[in-house]
């Protein structure tokens, strides 16, 4: 009986070259629960508004502005975050802040 064949007998071994710094892999993924920090205050405010858009406990957000949705949730006693109202009042004419995450999608 012959010797047991290995997979490397059929396929050549290919060694990969490492990158210029000696590392062949990229950055490690962030730890669970660790969220990337926003670049600046405006980006942090937009992220707060995106999270408000994704929170369904305040009702649907299609077809109305974020301020209208916030006021409707307040009237219904759903206690929307006051930080959202403050951000919306500081940027009254900016559609990036006033329109919801879904405003570009047709109904």
Curated annotation (Swiss-Prot):
Ubiquitinated; undergoes 'Lys-48'-linked ubiquitination in response to UV irradiation, leading to proteasomal degradation. This modification is partly mediated by RNF8 and by the DCX(DTL) E3 ubiquitin ligase complex (also called CRL4(CDT2)). Efficient degradation requires the presence of PCNA and is required for the inhibition of fork progression after DNA damage. Residues 1-44 are annotated as: Disordered. Changing residue 16 to A: Increased stability following UV irradiation and no trough during S phase. A motif (PCNA-interaction protein motif (PIP box)) lies at residues 1-16. It comes from Homo sapiens (Human). Changing residue 8 to A: Strongly increased stability following UV irradiation. Belongs to the DNA polymerase delta subunit 4 family. One of its GO terms (cellular component) is nucleoplasm. It comes from the Eukaryota. This is DNA polymerase delta subunit 4. It is found in: Nucleus. The keyword Aminoacyl-tRNA synthetase does not apply. Changing residue 8 to D: Complete loss of PCNA binding.
């Amino acid at each position: 009986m012959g010797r047991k064949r290995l997979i490397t007998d059929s396929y050549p071994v290919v060694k990969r070259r490492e990158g210029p710094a000696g590392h062949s892999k990229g950055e490690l993924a962030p730890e669970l629960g660790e969220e990337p920090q926003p670049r600046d205050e405006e980006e942090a405010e937009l992220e707060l508004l995106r999270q408000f858009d994704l929170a369904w406990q305040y009702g649907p957000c299609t077809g109305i502005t974020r301020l209208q949705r916030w006021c409707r949730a307040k009237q219904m006693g759903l206690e929307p975050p006051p930080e959202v109202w403050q951000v919306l009042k500081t940027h009254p004419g900016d559609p990036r802040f006033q329109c919801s995450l879904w405003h570009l999608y047709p109904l």
